[in-house]
Amino acid sequence: MSKSRRTRSTSRPTSRPQPASCPCGLPEVYEACCGRFHSGAADAPTAALLMRSRYCAFVRRDEAYLLRTWHPRTRPAEVDFDPRMRWTGLEILGTTEGSAFHSAGTVTFRASYRGGALQERSRFERIGGAWVYVDGEFFE
């Protein structure tokens, strides 16, 4: 009586890697979250979402988006990215106004980076219906 040899496949089904969630901290993939704002497909409907999308733009070093969403009155000629800076998280601490029904608003946030964090209260205004960053005040 001969024994037949069975060979067992040791390969596992290949699964596609899951897309990473957006750097802004919301549980959506970048393309469905801040990516749509960065590409120009949509405008951020609130000051808080603009803040998140700008944080994400700093993470991705998207200078064009940052300049496009900066108030013309306070916009710098260029964004000075620190090549050593590694952003690690964003926490929205509070907002005042800044909804689709307002023309101005503030967002207070903590942005963490490798080695520390910064806290800022940012001011936003609407120009032609689109939210733009005006300026911010750092605090501890």
Swiss-Prot record:
Region Disordered: start-end pairs: 1-22
Gene3D superfamilies: 3.10.450.50
Stored SUPFAM superfamilies: NTF2-like
Chain intervals with Low complexity compositional bias: 10-19
Family: Belongs to the UPF0225 family.
Name of the protein described by the UniProt record: UPF0225 protein SAV_6631
Organism: Streptomyces avermitilis (strain ATCC 31267 / DSM 46492 / JCM 5070 / NBRC 14893 / NCIMB 12804 / NRRL 8165 / MA-4680)
Organism lineage: Bacteria, Bacillati, Actinomycetota, Actinomycetes, Kitasatosporales
